[in-house]
Amino acid sequence: MSRIGKRPIPIPAKVSVAIDGRLVSVKGPKGELSRELPSGVVVTQEDGNIIVSRADESRLARQRHGLSRTLVANLVEGVDSGFQKRLEIIGVGYRAQVQGTTLILNVGYSNPVQIEPPEGIQFVVENNTNVVVSGISKEVVGNTAARIRAVRPPEPYKGKGIRYAGEVVLRKAGKTGKK
């Protein structure tokens, strides 16, 4: 049995869960999320916990068991406390700012790069070089952070670019000159 899938998901006090077949809707202090789970899994609510189990023992159901449990757990955590991803901008003259809701990145291109946030996502810029992407959906927060990083990924020679906080960038030695 899936070790992740068999763990129950505790429901926090301020969160309400509605299960309608394969559709799971979660409402909490930060907002509301819903997701349709893949076939082959059954979701039930028992005394303050959500339990994800398999409909049968097929290979597909076994594959989707742990995935479905994690997806539901992310819904519950998102509406209760939310998610955030931090990015660092490294490079001389590289900086970020927020204008209204739009993130504006000056990262060495001739024009600044403007990034509009998807619905439910907020950008916060700390001291011009740190960007915090926050929201209630882990998937959307991660995808938005990846889009920002893709504007100028860290390069291996000087390490300039946009990276996740704590990301280790492998550095390369430059060419050695001929003597």
From Swiss-Prot:
Transmembrane intervals: none
Biological processes annotated in GO: cytoplasmic translation
PROSITE patterns, per the entry: RIBOSOMAL_L6_1
Protein origin, superkingdom: Bacteria
SUPFAM superfamilies cross-referenced by the UniProt entry: Ribosomal protein L6 (SSF56053)
GO CC terms, sorted: cytosolic large ribosomal subunit
Subunit and interaction comment: Part of the 50S ribosomal subunit.
Functional note: This protein binds to the 23S rRNA, and is important in its secondary structure. It is located near the subunit interface in the base of the L7/L12 stalk, and near the tRNA binding site of the peptidyltransferase center.
Name of the protein in its database record: Large ribosomal subunit protein uL6
Gene assigned in the entry: rplF
